[in-house]
Protein backbone atom coordinates (compact mmCIF):
# COMPACT_ATOMS: atom_id res chain seq x y z
CA UNK A 1 0.00 0.00 0.00
CA UNK A 2 1.79 3.14 -1.21
CA UNK A 3 -1.16 5.51 -1.15
CA UNK A 4 -2.73 7.40 1.74
CA UNK A 5 -3.90 5.19 4.61
CA UNK A 6 -7.63 5.81 4.93
CA UNK A 7 -8.98 5.51 8.45
CA UNK A 8 -12.47 4.98 9.75
CA UNK A 9 -13.19 5.89 13.38
CA UNK A 10 -15.78 3.77 15.16
CA UNK A 11 -17.24 5.70 18.15
CA UNK A 12 -17.12 9.39 18.94
CA UNK A 13 -16.00 9.70 22.57
CA UNK A 14 -13.02 11.49 24.07
CA UNK A 15 -10.33 9.06 22.96
CA UNK A 16 -11.74 9.06 19.41
CA UNK A 17 -11.43 12.85 19.36
CA UNK A 18 -7.83 12.67 20.57
CA UNK A 19 -7.11 10.10 17.87
CA UNK A 20 -8.57 12.31 15.14
CA UNK A 21 -6.61 15.32 16.39
CA UNK A 22 -3.29 13.50 16.47
CA UNK A 23 -3.81 11.88 13.07
CA UNK A 24 -3.84 15.35 11.51
CA UNK A 25 -0.09 15.52 12.21
CA UNK A 26 0.70 12.29 10.36
CA UNK A 27 1.52 12.65 6.65
CA UNK A 28 -0.03 10.04 4.40
CA UNK A 29 -2.93 9.19 6.71
CA UNK A 30 -6.42 10.65 7.00
CA UNK A 31 -9.78 9.93 8.59
CA UNK A 32 -12.34 9.49 5.82
CA UNK A 33 -15.34 8.17 7.77
CA UNK A 34 -16.77 8.00 11.28
CA UNK A 35 -19.56 5.91 12.78
CA UNK A 36 -21.59 6.12 15.95
CA UNK A 37 -24.74 4.55 17.34
CA UNK A 38 -26.56 7.71 16.26
CA UNK A 39 -26.23 9.73 13.07
CA UNK A 40 -26.40 12.96 15.07
CA UNK A 41 -23.29 12.09 17.03
CA UNK A 42 -21.46 10.90 13.93
CA UNK A 43 -22.30 14.06 11.98
CA UNK A 44 -21.19 16.32 14.83
CA UNK A 45 -17.86 14.49 15.05
CA UNK A 46 -17.42 14.63 11.27
CA UNK A 47 -18.08 18.36 11.19
CA UNK A 48 -15.64 18.96 14.05
CA UNK A 49 -12.78 17.14 12.32
CA UNK A 50 -13.61 17.69 8.65
CA UNK A 51 -14.41 14.04 7.96
CA UNK A 52 -16.26 13.50 4.66
CA UNK A 53 -18.61 10.65 5.65
CA UNK A 54 -20.62 10.01 8.82
CA UNK A 55 -22.67 6.92 9.60
CA UNK A 56 -25.32 6.32 12.25
CA UNK A 57 -24.50 2.61 12.43
CA UNK A 58 -21.33 0.55 12.59
CA UNK A 59 -22.13 -1.77 9.69
CA UNK A 60 -22.09 1.07 7.17
CA UNK A 61 -18.57 2.03 8.20
CA UNK A 62 -17.43 -1.59 7.99
CA UNK A 63 -18.88 -1.80 4.47
CA UNK A 64 -17.27 1.44 3.24
CA UNK A 65 -14.93 0.46 0.38
CA UNK A 66 -12.88 3.62 0.83
CA UNK A 67 -11.84 2.71 4.40
CA UNK A 68 -8.62 0.70 4.81
CA UNK A 69 -8.40 0.41 8.58
CA UNK A 70 -10.82 1.05 11.43
CA UNK A 71 -9.94 2.48 14.84
CA UNK A 72 -12.30 0.94 17.42
CA UNK A 73 -12.79 3.46 20.23
CA UNK A 74 -15.88 2.07 21.95
CA UNK A 75 -16.08 1.09 25.63
CA UNK A 76 -14.34 -2.22 26.42
CA UNK A 77 -17.63 -4.10 26.39
CA UNK A 78 -18.09 -3.44 22.66
CA UNK A 79 -14.52 -4.05 21.48
CA UNK A 80 -15.07 -7.65 20.43
CA UNK A 81 -18.35 -6.91 18.62
CA UNK A 82 -17.04 -3.84 16.80
CA UNK A 83 -13.66 -5.29 15.86
CA UNK A 84 -15.19 -8.57 14.67
CA UNK A 85 -17.70 -6.68 12.52
CA UNK A 86 -14.90 -4.80 10.80
CA UNK A 87 -12.64 -7.83 10.38
CA UNK A 88 -15.48 -9.86 8.90
CA UNK A 89 -16.00 -7.03 6.40
CA UNK A 90 -12.33 -7.23 5.37
CA UNK A 91 -11.08 -4.19 7.27
CA UNK A 92 -7.82 -3.94 9.17
CA UNK A 93 -8.35 -2.95 12.81
CA UNK A 94 -6.66 -0.95 15.55
CA UNK A 95 -8.62 -1.71 18.74
CA UNK A 96 -8.40 0.37 21.90
CA UNK A 97 -6.97 -1.09 25.06
CA UNK A 98 -7.81 -3.01 27.08
CA UNK A 99 -8.05 -5.22 24.00
CA UNK A 100 -11.30 -6.91 25.07
CA UNK A 101 -13.18 -7.77 28.27
CA UNK A 102 -11.40 -11.09 28.71
CA UNK A 103 -8.88 -13.42 27.11
CA UNK A 104 -11.55 -15.54 25.43
CA UNK A 105 -12.83 -12.54 23.46
CA UNK A 106 -9.27 -11.56 22.55
CA UNK A 107 -8.52 -15.06 21.28
CA UNK A 108 -11.61 -14.91 19.06
CA UNK A 109 -10.47 -11.65 17.47
CA UNK A 110 -6.91 -12.83 16.94
CA UNK A 111 -8.09 -16.04 15.30
CA UNK A 112 -10.46 -14.11 13.04
CA UNK A 113 -7.74 -11.68 11.94
CA UNK A 114 -5.18 -14.41 11.35
CA UNK A 115 -7.63 -16.61 9.46
CA UNK A 116 -8.49 -13.72 7.15
CA UNK A 117 -4.96 -12.38 6.77
CA UNK A 118 -5.90 -8.97 8.18
CA UNK A 119 -3.94 -6.56 10.33
CA UNK A 120 -5.03 -6.34 13.97
CA UNK A 121 -3.36 -4.44 16.79
CA UNK A 122 -4.24 -3.41 20.32
CA UNK A 123 -3.89 0.36 20.73
CA UNK A 124 -1.26 0.07 23.47
CA UNK A 125 0.30 3.36 22.45
CA UNK A 126 2.95 3.17 25.21
CA UNK A 127 4.73 0.39 23.31
CA UNK A 128 5.09 2.72 20.30
CA UNK A 129 6.39 5.71 22.26
CA UNK A 130 9.97 6.53 21.23
CA UNK A 131 11.17 7.00 24.82
CA UNK A 132 9.75 3.64 25.90
CA UNK A 133 11.32 2.02 22.85
CA UNK A 134 14.67 3.55 23.83
CA UNK A 135 14.28 2.12 27.33
CA UNK A 136 13.54 -1.38 26.06
CA UNK A 137 16.63 -1.24 23.86
CA UNK A 138 18.80 -0.34 26.85
CA UNK A 139 17.30 -3.06 29.03
CA UNK A 140 17.69 -5.70 26.34
CA UNK A 141 21.29 -4.58 25.77
CA UNK A 142 22.01 -5.25 29.47
CA UNK A 143 22.30 -1.66 30.71
CA UNK A 144 20.81 -2.59 34.10
CA UNK A 145 21.68 -6.29 34.08
CA UNK A 146 18.97 -8.83 34.76
CA UNK A 147 15.63 -7.25 35.64
CA UNK A 148 14.56 -8.12 39.18
CA UNK A 149 11.71 -5.74 40.00
CA UNK A 150 9.26 -3.52 38.16
CA UNK A 151 7.12 -1.00 40.00
CA UNK A 152 4.40 1.05 38.29
CA UNK A 153 1.14 2.71 39.22
CA UNK A 154 -1.72 4.50 37.51
CA UNK A 155 -4.35 6.06 39.72
CA UNK A 156 -6.70 8.99 39.19
CA UNK A 157 -9.76 10.41 40.90
CA UNK A 158 -13.11 11.19 39.32
CA UNK A 159 -15.73 12.08 39.96
CA UNK A 160 -16.72 8.56 38.92
CA UNK A 161 -20.02 8.33 40.76
CA UNK A 162 -22.89 5.88 40.43
CA UNK A 163 -23.99 5.72 36.80
CA UNK A 164 -20.54 6.41 35.37
CA UNK A 165 -19.30 3.77 32.93
CA UNK A 166 -16.36 3.00 35.24
CA UNK A 167 -18.86 1.81 37.87
CA UNK A 168 -20.74 -0.49 35.50
CA UNK A 169 -19.67 -4.17 35.31
CA UNK A 170 -21.53 -4.59 32.01
CA UNK A 171 -19.21 -1.99 30.45
CA UNK A 172 -16.04 -3.53 31.88
CA UNK A 173 -15.93 -0.85 34.57
CA UNK A 174 -13.35 -0.47 37.29
CA UNK A 175 -9.73 0.60 37.49
CA UNK A 176 -8.17 -2.56 36.08
CA UNK A 177 -9.14 -2.50 32.39
CA UNK A 178 -8.96 1.29 32.03
CA UNK A 179 -5.80 2.00 34.01
CA UNK A 180 -4.31 -1.24 35.32
CA UNK A 181 -3.69 -2.40 31.78
CA UNK A 182 -0.87 0.19 31.59
CA UNK A 183 1.32 -1.05 34.46
CA UNK A 184 0.57 -4.69 33.59
CA UNK A 185 1.52 -4.11 29.94
CA UNK A 186 4.63 -2.18 31.03
CA UNK A 187 5.83 -5.06 33.19
CA UNK A 188 5.07 -7.66 30.53
CA UNK A 189 6.86 -5.62 27.87
CA UNK A 190 10.04 -6.33 29.82
CA UNK A 191 9.39 -9.73 31.37
CA UNK A 192 6.69 -11.46 29.35
CA UNK A 193 3.77 -13.33 30.89
CA UNK A 194 4.05 -14.02 34.64
CA UNK A 195 3.55 -17.46 36.12
CA UNK A 196 2.36 -16.13 39.49
CA UNK A 197 -0.40 -13.58 40.04
CA UNK A 198 -1.54 -12.20 43.39
CA UNK A 199 -3.93 -9.30 43.85
CA UNK A 200 -6.07 -7.46 46.37
CA UNK A 201 -8.70 -4.82 45.71
CA UNK A 202 -11.27 -2.42 47.05
CA UNK A 203 -14.55 -3.16 45.28
CA UNK A 204 -17.53 -0.88 44.67
CA UNK A 205 -21.12 -1.77 45.59
CA UNK A 206 -21.63 -2.51 41.88
CA UNK A 207 -18.83 -5.08 41.97
CA UNK A 208 -16.06 -3.32 40.03
CA UNK A 209 -12.58 -2.63 41.37
CA UNK A 210 -11.97 0.88 42.66
CA UNK A 211 -8.37 0.23 43.66
CA UNK A 212 -6.27 -2.84 42.87
CA UNK A 213 -2.80 -3.87 44.00
CA UNK A 214 -1.03 -6.61 42.04
CA UNK A 215 2.07 -8.70 42.67
CA UNK A 216 3.24 -10.59 39.59
CA UNK A 217 6.04 -13.12 39.59
CA UNK A 218 8.35 -14.74 37.04
CA UNK A 219 9.88 -17.84 38.62
CA UNK A 220 12.47 -18.63 35.96
CA UNK A 221 13.68 -15.03 35.70
CA UNK A 222 13.63 -14.49 39.46
CA UNK A 223 11.69 -11.27 38.92
CA UNK A 224 8.58 -9.62 40.32
CA UNK A 225 6.39 -6.60 39.66
CA UNK A 226 4.44 -4.52 42.17
CA UNK A 227 1.66 -2.68 40.36
CA UNK A 228 -1.27 -0.51 41.41
CA UNK A 229 -4.27 1.07 39.71
CA UNK A 230 -7.05 3.20 41.12
CA UNK A 231 -10.03 5.38 40.32
CA UNK A 232 -10.26 6.64 43.92
CA UNK A 233 -6.63 7.65 44.58
CA UNK A 234 -4.39 10.05 42.69
CA UNK A 235 -1.15 8.04 42.55
CA UNK A 236 2.22 9.34 41.27
CA UNK A 237 1.86 7.46 37.94
CA UNK A 238 5.56 6.65 37.94
CA UNK A 239 7.53 3.52 37.06
CA UNK A 240 10.84 2.03 38.08
CA UNK A 241 12.80 -0.95 36.74
CA UNK A 242 15.56 -2.36 38.94
CA UNK A 243 18.15 -4.80 37.68
CA UNK A 244 21.31 -6.42 38.97
CA UNK A 245 23.47 -3.60 37.57
CA UNK A 246 21.28 -0.51 37.80
CA UNK A 247 17.87 1.12 37.81
CA UNK A 248 15.69 3.08 35.41
CA UNK A 249 13.21 5.63 36.77
CA UNK A 250 10.32 7.17 34.86
CA UNK A 251 8.75 10.42 36.09
CA UNK A 252 4.96 10.87 36.35
CA UNK A 253 3.28 9.84 33.12
CA UNK A 254 5.41 6.73 32.53
CA UNK A 255 2.91 5.54 29.91
CA UNK A 256 3.82 8.51 27.65
CA UNK A 257 7.12 9.83 28.99
CA UNK A 258 9.32 12.67 27.88
CA UNK A 259 12.37 11.12 29.51
CA UNK A 260 13.75 8.54 31.91
CA UNK A 261 16.85 8.38 34.11
CA UNK A 262 19.37 5.55 34.21
CA UNK A 263 21.15 5.00 37.55
CA UNK A 264 24.24 2.77 37.73
CA UNK A 265 26.74 2.35 40.57
CA UNK A 266 29.86 4.41 39.94
CA UNK A 267 28.19 6.53 37.25
CA UNK A 268 26.38 9.84 37.30
CA UNK A 269 22.64 9.56 36.57
CA UNK A 270 22.02 9.61 32.81
CA UNK A 271 18.89 11.19 31.37
CA UNK A 272 17.51 9.79 28.14
CA UNK A 273 14.99 11.28 25.73
CA UNK A 274 14.19 10.37 22.15
CA UNK A 275 13.48 12.25 18.97
CA UNK A 276 9.78 13.06 18.81
CA UNK A 277 9.25 12.24 22.47
CA UNK A 278 6.85 13.78 24.94
CA UNK A 279 4.22 16.04 23.44
CA UNK A 280 5.92 15.57 20.07
CA UNK A 281 4.34 18.68 18.68
CA UNK A 282 2.09 21.41 19.98
CA UNK A 283 -1.34 20.11 20.92
CA UNK A 284 -0.52 16.44 20.31
CA UNK A 285 -1.19 13.69 22.86
CA UNK A 286 1.07 10.91 21.61
CA UNK A 287 -1.29 8.69 19.65
CA UNK A 288 0.53 9.59 16.44
CA UNK A 289 3.20 7.01 17.28
CA UNK A 290 0.78 4.08 17.19
CA UNK A 291 -0.88 5.60 14.12
CA UNK A 292 2.48 5.74 12.37
CA UNK A 293 3.19 2.12 13.31
CA UNK A 294 -0.12 0.95 11.84
CA UNK A 295 0.55 2.89 8.62
CA UNK A 296 4.07 1.46 8.40
CA UNK A 297 2.82 -2.10 8.91
CA UNK A 298 0.05 -1.75 6.33
CA UNK A 299 2.42 -0.35 3.73
CA UNK A 300 4.81 -3.23 4.44
CA UNK A 301 2.03 -5.78 4.05
CA UNK A 302 2.33 -6.94 7.66
CA UNK A 303 -0.66 -8.35 9.56
CA UNK A 304 0.86 -7.87 13.02
CA UNK A 305 3.05 -5.19 14.54
CA UNK A 306 6.38 -6.24 16.04
CA UNK A 307 5.97 -3.41 18.55
CA UNK A 308 2.54 -4.56 19.78
CA UNK A 309 2.41 -8.27 18.91
CA UNK A 310 -0.91 -10.06 19.25
CA UNK A 311 0.58 -12.82 21.40
CA UNK A 312 1.65 -10.11 23.84
CA UNK A 313 -1.86 -8.65 23.95
CA UNK A 314 -3.27 -12.13 24.59
CA UNK A 315 -0.79 -12.62 27.44
CA UNK A 316 -1.82 -9.32 29.03
CA UNK A 317 -5.49 -10.30 28.81
CA UNK A 318 -4.73 -13.60 30.55
CA UNK A 319 -3.02 -11.71 33.36
CA UNK A 320 -5.96 -9.31 33.70
CA UNK A 321 -8.31 -12.31 33.84
CA UNK A 322 -6.16 -13.84 36.59
CA UNK A 323 -6.21 -10.58 38.56
CA UNK A 324 -10.00 -10.38 38.30
CA UNK A 325 -10.24 -13.98 39.45
CA UNK A 326 -8.16 -13.16 42.54
CA UNK A 327 -10.17 -10.06 43.47
CA UNK A 328 -13.60 -11.48 42.65
CA UNK A 329 -14.62 -9.21 39.77
CA UNK A 330 -16.77 -10.73 37.04
CA UNK A 331 -18.41 -9.15 34.02
CA UNK A 332 -21.68 -10.37 32.48
CA UNK A 333 -19.74 -11.23 29.30
CA UNK A 334 -17.64 -13.75 31.25
CA UNK A 335 -20.61 -16.11 31.23
Regions found by a protein language model. Name each.
Residues 55, 95, 120-122, 250:
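Hydrophobic residues in well-ordered beta-strands that form the structural core
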Residues 108-126, 146-149:
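Rossmann-fold dehydrogenase core element
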Residues 1, 69-71, 296-335:
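C-terminal helix-rich "cap/oligomerization" subdomain common to oxidoreductases
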Residues 1, 185-257, 286, 294-300:
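Contiguous beta-strand/loop segments that form the cofactor/metal-binding neighborhood of enzyme cores
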Residues 277-292, 308:
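Active-site loop of classical SDR/Rossmann-like NAD(P)-dependent oxidoreductases
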Residues 126-198:
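Predominantly a Rossmann-like dinucleotide-binding segment in NAD(P)-dependent oxidoreductases
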Residues 49-111:
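Beta-loop-alpha module in the N-terminal Rossmann-like domain of NAD(P)-dependent dehydrogenases
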Residues 1-49, 329:
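N-terminal Rossmann-like dinucleotide-binding module
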